[in-house]
Amino acid sequence: MARYRGAVERLERRFGVSLALKGERRLSGKSALDKRAYGPGQHGQRRAKTSDYGLQLKEKQKAKMMYGISEKQFRSIFVEANRLDGNTGENLIRLIERRLDNVVYRMGFATTRSSARQLVTHGHVLVDGKRLDIPSYFVRSGQKIEIKEKTKSNSQVVRAMELTAQTGIVPWIDVEKDKKYGIFTRYPEREEVVVPIEERLIVELYSK
């Protein structure tokens, strides 16, 4: 499945939660979901009964859309999560949070994960001082993530950092805002990752 490129706010209304796909509008309270907290379309306010499979599939689609991950990549991450010790669902979320594009977003260098992915793919991000343009790269504990010198004054990066001041930085990351770099200090615990995803349903789906 290719990445979704349609009306993202309509998508958020379908899932009934914010997927952090629209940066400034989400923070301003002016998103379509804030105004109409029900599904899109003529019958959007009706609550249709959904099967167990439908709920599981919807949860997987929600996670993929939120993080901007293709089906192939998502399944690959699940396989790795299942291989690791511990709870597969928690491993899944923790692995996804380690993706470079997501870490750039979490550090506040971009207002959305999509924008963070563009920064990475266009070569604007350094990992331990070396350019890395692979969004799916798993960041390791202790690694330094930095915006390239020429990009530090970019208006979108500066604006993103200003908006991040409203929401704060997650506890497993330290950021030097003035110098536009951050340290991925440790792997997050599941309870620290605030995302509207029931990973248990995704595990059930892939375990069939």
From Swiss-Prot:
<comment type="function">
    <text>With S5 and S12 plays an important role in translational accuracy.</text>
</comment>
<feature type="region of interest" description="Disordered">
    <location>
        <begin position="31"/>
        <end position="51"/>
    </location>
</feature>
<dbReference type="GO" id="GO:0015935">
    <property type="term" value="C:small ribosomal subunit"/>
</dbReference>
<keyword id="KW-0694">RNA-binding</keyword>
<dbReference type="InterPro" id="IPR018079">
    <property type="entry name" value="Ribosomal_uS4_CS"/>
</dbReference>
<dbReference type="InterPro" id="IPR036986">
    <property type="entry name" value="S4_RNA-bd_sf"/>
</dbReference>
<keyword id="KW-0689">Ribosomal protein</keyword>
<comment type="similarity">
    <text>Belongs to the universal ribosomal protein uS4 family.</text>
</comment>
<dbReference type="InterPro" id="IPR002942">
    <property type="entry name" value="S4_RNA-bd"/>
</dbReference>
<dbReference type="Pfam" id="PF01479">
    <property type="entry name" value="S4"/>
</dbReference>
<dbReference type="GO" id="GO:0003735">
    <property type="term" value="F:structural constituent of ribosome"/>
</dbReference>
<keyword id="KW-0687">Ribonucleoprotein</keyword>
<dbReference type="Pfam" id="PF00163">
    <property type="entry name" value="Ribosomal_S4"/>
</dbReference>
<keyword id="KW-0699">rRNA-binding</keyword>
<dbReference type="InterPro" id="IPR022801">
    <property type="entry name" value="Ribosomal_uS4"/>
</dbReference>
<comment type="subunit">
    <text>Part of the 30S ribosomal subunit. Contacts protein S5. The interaction surface between S4 and S5 is involved in control of translational fidelity.</text>
</comment>
<dbReference type="GO" id="GO:0042274">
    <property type="term" value="P:ribosomal small subunit biogenesis"/>
</dbReference>
<protein>
    <recommendedName>
        <fullName>Small ribosomal subunit protein uS4</fullName>
    </recommendedName>
</protein>
<dbReference type="GO" id="GO:0006412">
    <property type="term" value="P:translation"/>
</dbReference>
<dbReference type="GO" id="GO:0019843">
    <property type="term" value="F:rRNA binding"/>
</dbReference>
<dbReference type="InterPro" id="IPR005709">
    <property type="entry name" value="Ribosomal_uS4_bac-type"/>
</dbReference>
<comment type="function">
    <text>One of the primary rRNA binding proteins, it binds directly to 16S rRNA where it nucleates assembly of the body of the 30S subunit.</text>
</comment>
<dbReference type="InterPro" id="IPR001912">
    <property type="entry name" value="Ribosomal_uS4_N"/>
</dbReference>
<feature type="domain" description="S4 RNA-binding">
    <location>
        <begin position="98"/>
        <end position="160"/>
    </location>
</feature>
